[in-house]
């Protein structure tokens, strides 16, 4: 059996707990710690039941054990407001930080677009936002064919899937996502909108992507590029589905998506969680495989987590 890279989860909320389930079935990652601030949180209880060490004393409760437990990678699923300090403390101990907050201290990563181009020596990688992970691949699919003058994304998510951390970071969400639409998606100007839908029963994550190309769009080439990108995202998020499009109207290209989650921690309507945590796990597996010098792929099935 291949040895595994040990990792820690910081944040015991929706995102951290969903990520836990994905890491438990990894071939190259071994979650050994979960950090929270609420001793009664469901996430800490689930982590402890899965055999992880847990602390409710925040990041400072983990630091004394980092070296002894050989933690090499940490995932921060807390808040943009505290991420910088979390990252500084762990980076000083040689831990690579994968940031699931909108803090955007390190370079952005959207796996099918730029994962392979990331510098191996960076110590902080930002996973943009759930809306960014869902929509930026589509902006990139268009911009890889021809120049995109303006890219606008609208991410609609179920209210039940949005925890307190995300609600506190709405402004950071829109700024960070818009920036990544430009930097990673390739649009000259980007805009991001998030809609938190209170409908019951909860709806699946839905995303709309508008791209304004500089020239008349090459409909055949853009359509082929979009379908190819959909397949790449589906390798780690099987519920990522093109519902309509690309629809062409003059220079405007519109794409409609739906994202269904695996139902690891929250129900399947929380595709916004699933695409974020799956992207983070995929990124960490790439880092771990380089540390171990092995080839690997993310196991996306649920059953292995409980085996």
Swiss-Prot record:
What keywords were assigned to this record?
Aromatic hydrocarbons catabolism, NAD, Oxidoreductase
Superkingdom of this entry's organism? Bacteria
Q: Which residues bind NAD(+)?
A: 12-15, 161-169, 272
Give the similarity note: Belongs to the acetaldehyde dehydrogenase family.
> Catalysed reaction per UniProt?
acetaldehyde + NAD(+) + CoA = acetyl-CoA + NADH + H(+)
EC primary class: oxidoreductase
What EC number(s) is this enzyme filed under?
A: 1.2.1.10
Record's InterPro entries?
Answer: Acetaldehyde_dehydrogenase, Acetylaldehyde_DH_C, NAD(P)-bd_dom_sf, Semialdehyde_DH_NAD-bd
Q: Give a GO molecular function annotation for the protein.
A: NAD binding
Name under which the protein is recorded: Acetaldehyde dehydrogenase
- The active-site annotation reads 130
Any GO BP annotation: catabolic process
Species name: Shewanella pealeana (strain ATCC 700345 / ANG-SQ1)
């Amino acid at each position: 059996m291949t040895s595994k890279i040990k990792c820690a989860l910081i944040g015991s909320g929706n995102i951290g707990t969903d990520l836990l389930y994905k890491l438990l079935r990894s071939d190259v990652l071994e979650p050994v710690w979960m950090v929270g601030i609420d001793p009664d949180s469901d996430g800490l209880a689930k982590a402890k039941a899965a055999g992880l060490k847990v602390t409710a004393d925040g990041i400072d409760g983990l630091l004394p054990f980092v070296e002894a437990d050989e933690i090499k990678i940490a995932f921060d699923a807390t808040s943009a407001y505290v991420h910088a300090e979390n990252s500084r403390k762990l980076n000083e101990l040689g831990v690579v930080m994968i940031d699931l907050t909108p803090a955007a201290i390190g370079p952005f990563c959207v796996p099918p677009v730029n994962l392979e181009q990331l510098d191996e020596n960076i110590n902080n990688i930002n996973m943009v936002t759930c809306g960014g992970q869902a929509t930026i691949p589509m902006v990139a699919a268009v911009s890889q064919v021809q120049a995109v003058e303006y890219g606008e994304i609208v991410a609609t998510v179920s209210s039940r899937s949005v925890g307190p951390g995300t609600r506190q970071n709405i402004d950071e969400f829109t700024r960070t996502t818009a920036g990544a639409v430009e930097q990673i998606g390739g649009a000259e100007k980007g805009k991001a909108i998030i809609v938190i839908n209170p409908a019951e029963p909860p709806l699946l994550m839905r995303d709309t992507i508008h791209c304004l190309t500089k020239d008349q769009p090459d409909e055949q080439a853009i359509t082929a590029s979009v379908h190819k990108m959909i397949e790449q995202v589906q390798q780690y998020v099987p519920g990522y589905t093109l519902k309509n499009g690309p629809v062409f109207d003059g220079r405007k290209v519109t794409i409609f998506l739906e994202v269904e989650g695996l139902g690891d921690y929250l129900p399947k309507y929380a595709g916004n969680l699933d695409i974020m945590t799956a992207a983070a796990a995929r990124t960490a597996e790439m880092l771990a495989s380089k540390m171990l010098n092995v080839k690997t792929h993310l196991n996306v099935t649920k059953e292995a987590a409980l085996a």
